[in-house]
Amino acid sequence: MPKIANSGDGSGLMRTPEVAGKIVTAVKQAVSVPVTVKCRLGWDKGSINVLDFTKRMEDCGADMITVHGRTRSMLYSGTADWEMIRKVKAQCRVPVIANGDIVDGPSAVRCLHWTGADGLMIGRATFGDPWVFTEVRAALKGEPVPPRPPLAARVDTA
């Protein structure tokens, strides 16, 4: 969301990792539930700082980190960089969740295999297609994909 990011919040915190770290530390001290962080690769291709950022978040107490494999300036264009997610996973002790370009069962399997992530976050692929979760679950278990509901059921869901 441009209004949020441009005011220094959301993905805008990638530009001020020290502030993001202070937020994680404060939240961690204030709550008794796990504290998670979601970030992108960086603000733009000239400021990719996800490795330093996620290390700092982990050091400040984050219990899990989700990485969207694009920069803020990419928004949802281009291809998610699963290699960078793999690098984050390699350096983190906390669970890492991969996000970006997971659109169906086969892409979910490829993403987990490539990144070594502990889990997946599916975003835009769910818009108008909540059955994608059934497809992904089947693919991850190596099972056949169940048929989609009949058109009438899909229309009712919409």
Indicate residue ranges for each PLM-predicted region.
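Glycine-rich tight-turn/loop motif centered on a GG-T
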Residues: 2-19, 70-82, 141-145
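Alpha/beta catalytic cores of nucleotide-metabolism and tRNA/nucleoside-modifying enzymes
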Residues: 22-25, 30-32, 46-64, 83-98, ...
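Active-site beta->alpha loop and helix N-cap motifs at the rims of alpha/beta catalytic domains
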Residues: 1-35, 40-48, 58
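Active-site-proximal loop/turn and secondary-structure-junction residues that shape catalytic pockets
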Residues: 1, 35, 39-45, 69-73, ...
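Glycine- and other small-residue-rich loops at beta-strand/loop junctions that grip anionic moieties
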Residues: 12-16, 38, 74-77, 97-101, ...
